[in-house]
Amino acid sequence: MKIQGVFRNRWKTALIGGGLGLLWCVGCLLPAAAAADSLTLWYDRPADGYPDARKPRKAWERHALPLGNGFLGAMLFGGPAEEHLQLNLHSLWSGGPGVPGWKPAPNLEGAAAHLPEIRQTLLAGDRKKAQALSTEWLRGDGPGDRAELNKLFGAYQTFGDLFIATGTAEPVTEYRRALDLSTALHTVRYRSGGARFTRTAFCSYPDRCLVVRFAADQPGRQNLSLRLTSPHAVRGRAEDGVFVVRGTVRDNGLKLDVRVGALAEGGTVTVSDDGIRVEHADAVTFVLVGGTDYAQKWPTFRGADPAAKNRERLAAALRLGFARLKERHVADHHALHGRVSVDWGSTPEAIRALPTDVRLERNKKIPDLDLEELYFQFGRYLLIASSRPGSLPANLQGLWCDQLNPPWRIDYHLNINLEMNYWPSGPGNLLEC
C-alpha cells in the first residue's frame, strides 16, 4: 500500500496537531530507530543516559520507550544495572465517586433528543449554531478554574514504578535498546563481564499481561532483585509464590491490585513482602498483571474487586510460559500493525543505520524520508498499544502518564483531542482500535 498526498498530510496533522493528542509528544517519545530494520526504533544508551535526562521527567518524556495493550501500559528505561518500568492502568483515576463532596451530575432532560439536530447543523455548515446547541445540551460538571472542581473531577494517574536490579557492575559495551514496531517487542542487549545479556519485554493483549525476560549466553548469570513503588496507599506481600501489591487511590478509594510472578530457569526464587529475589538463574521471566475495581456503572463506577480476575489471569499466563506468551502476543499485534506499509522515498543505508535520535537531529536540515515512514508507523503502533477492544479510549497521552497531577488531567477532551486520536484509524487500517 502506497500512501501519499492527503493521507500523508492527515496523518501528520493527527500526530502533531493539538499538542497533547495521542502523540502529544511523538517527537519526544520517538527515541532511536533501527539499523537495518525500517520498523525498529533503537538507542545506543539507556533512557537516563542523555544529558537532558538528569531530570527524571525528561528521561521519561524524551527517551523511555512505550509498551501497552490498551489496559496496561509501561515506559521502559533500559538501564544495564537496573531496569525501570513506569506503570499505568487504564482505569486508574482520582476524583469522582468516593471523594467527599462528590455527587453525580444530573442528567440534562431532553439532551439526547438534540443530538440529531446538532449533527444536521454541523452537516449544514452552521458551526456557530452547532456550537451553541452543544454548549447548551452536551455538557456536564467538570474541571475548571476552581480547585474544588478539579479535586472532585480528578485525574488520570501513574500506578507507580517497577525496578529490577541486575547486579551488573562491570563496564558495559555493545549496548542497544530497541522497540520493534512490527512485533511490539522491546529489547535490551549489551556485553558485560564476559557475557552477552538480553532482555525482551512486551505487553500482551491476548493474555492481558506485561512480560519481561532476562537471559544471557552463560548459565547462572541472572541475579535479580524486583521491587515496586507507588504513590498510592498500597502495600506489598507474598502470596502463594507471587508478589502482590494491593491498596487504594487515596482520595476516592478505588481498589488497586498488581501481581508479579517469576519463572526461573535454574537458580532460586524468593518472594517476600518487599519483592522478588532471583539468584544464579540461567534466565528469568517476570509476568505482571494489574487492574482496578472501576466499572462503567453509573453512578458509583465500581465493580468487582480485581484480585480474583488478576489471580486467574496471572496463573494462566505463567502456565503458558515465555515462548507461548510471546508467540500469541506477536501474532495478535502483527495482525494489526502488519496491514499497512508506506513508501515515500528512500534514505541512504548509512543514514538508516544511525540511532533515531541522531536521525531526528539530522532531519532538521536534511530530509529523511524513511524516518517519516517510521514516524507514521510509530503513530499506528501507539494507537494499537493504547486502545483495544474492551479498554477505555486513548486519553490525552494515550495510555502513559508518570504523574499524579498531569497536564489537563490527561482526560477526554471532546472538543477535538479525542477525535484527533482516532482520525488516523481509518487511513491506518486500525478501525478495530
Residue ranges of each PLM-predicted region?
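N-terminal secretory signal peptides that target proteins for export/translocation
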Residues: 1-11
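Bacterial N-terminal signal peptides
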Residues: 17-28
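Aromatic-residue-lined binding/catalytic grooves and analogous aromatic/hydrophobic interfacial grooves
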Residues: 34-433
